[in-house]
């Protein structure tokens, strides 16, 4: 029978000092012996996805204490990728994931907490907490802050839906008036919550449902809706039950590695491909799997991408649907239900509700359930009122979107495409693979060939695009922006956005060893591995070289003879695989990250082999 970890600090005469300090935090005599549950919050006023989380920790803590636990809250950092985008701040985004994971480990292990509730929301916070959960392997429930409502405004006598990416595109488009650009800017992000499309934050919060680590609705229920409060309340109650099941009943099925096992990771990746999620999710799932000692790699993702169809198309891949529409169509449970009926889901995985996925779908998939409370839950909709307050409205759609032929979520037979929303490409320019979000690629660009135009950094690429140096038919190559080379593997949302604003979004491709925002669409290929700084062939490309992209064949090729590539490699070996003439200040903290970072095909995690021996 496991012993409560917290007993180390709460029992025995030799722990009198620790108990004295616990008492100073409010612990009473009859509390000692109860499980100590960490409430891992990420409130900050810097990030709209987290600005409303200040009171959420205490909401959860109150429910934990009512259910018989001791709740202790702490906070992690949170970087807003949108605000950090397009300047040196983006160097810090991906490395912050490792800091978040470490900070959770430090706090939980230093204070011997027995379990956790992780309150996350945005791009690197959910993955960082997930890595910590898999590393620590103590009972955990994730509950996120929820997505933002989609923006709306009237242009040309028509109401259109908006999000952050629309503001960026219009702001860079020289044909758009200042007045219209400002109108879109003011309308794009109307409420608290994670940005309203299927960007990285919402993708990751949806994946926690498929992994079994969060409750139904976690990925899709709006941050502003009153129904979301129930997710926080139930998380506080449920974590005490999970904790007691493990420590008092020796039930290891309550542990995250047994919930989010290999089959659950397959389910999460199937969901990601089916909903056209952010390509960043590949990095984060690979990283979390490594933390849990789960054998899951790019080969598994490649295999799955070839058989899972694209069932749900959401912004930025279409302006028609945002997360509020996904929720109306039944949310993640509905997508998983369609995957299950198509024979593409392992429905015997477990969830934090103590159910098998099959049992959970029977209760929460709107195409199966007759539970009126569940059907009402998925009719929760937007209010269209600017606010930074959680649970501030209780608007509902008149009816659910259960149209599985032409609606937001579709059956396998009526899929947006039989090819999934993400694909792994490989070839001599990316021997260990690269990722493309096929959900955002037009059909005519699934095969593309063109001359390279090479940039040694995102900054010079942006300058070149805006200066008109990039021409239709070219493949923009941005290198030395990988985990080591950046360092930090910057997102390339500005280059892709500016290509669109210059009218090149459908006539150019972009290849990088960096990564892309979940807001990216178009023929944008990232995560090229090995990266340039690690001796990858992307570092050998010259402007004018022909690059051939064939998504149906899952291939990407630099059409240069091997002998010529070898001659270029000898030259780069002598130069040390560094960008030419790049002026970039790199702090000690970022250099420390770069010194241990692996390439994207390994999840850009730290190379543990450097700590061995």
Curated annotation (Swiss-Prot):
Subunit structure: Homodimer.
Pathway named in the protein's UniProt entry: Amino-acid biosynthesis; L-isoleucine biosynthesis; L-isoleucine from 2-oxobutanoate: step 3/4; Amino-acid biosynthesis; L-valine biosynthesis; L-valine from pyruvate: step 3/4
Residues annotated with N6-carboxylysine modification: 124
GO CC, alphabetical: cytosol
Binding annotation for Mg(2+): 81, 123-124, 491
GO biological process: isoleucine biosynthetic process; L-valine biosynthetic process
Role, per record: Functions in the biosynthesis of branched-chain amino acids. Catalyzes the dehydration of (2R,3R)-2,3-dihydroxy-3-methylpentanoate (2,3-dihydroxy-3-methylvalerate) into 2-oxo-3-methylpentanoate (2-oxo-3-methylvalerate) and of (2R)-2,3-dihydroxy-3-methylbutanoate (2,3-dihydroxyisovalerate) into 2-oxo-3-methylbutanoate (2-oxoisovalerate), the penultimate precursor to L-isoleucine and L-valine, respectively.
A single MF term (Gene Ontology): magnesium ion binding
Binding positions for [2Fe-2S] cluster per the UniProt entry: 122, 195
UniProt keyword annotations, A-Z: 2Fe-2S, Amino-acid biosynthesis, Branched-chain amino acid biosynthesis, Iron, Iron-sulfur, Lyase, Magnesium, Metal-binding
Enzyme Commission code(s) on record: 4.2.1.9
Tagged with keyword ATP-binding: no
CC cofactor: [2Fe-2S] cluster; Mg(2+)
Reaction equation(s) it catalyzes: (2R)-2,3-dihydroxy-3-methylbutanoate = 3-methyl-2-oxobutanoate + H2O; (2R,3R)-2,3-dihydroxy-3-methylpentanoate = (S)-3-methyl-2-oxopentanoate + H2O
Co-factor binding details: Binds 1 [2Fe-2S] cluster per subunit. This cluster acts as a Lewis acid cofactor.
Catalytic site: 517 (proton acceptor)
Family per similarity comment: Belongs to the IlvD/Edd family.
A Pfam family annotated for this UniProt entry: ILV_EDD_C
Entry protein name: Dihydroxy-acid dehydratase
Root EC class: lyase
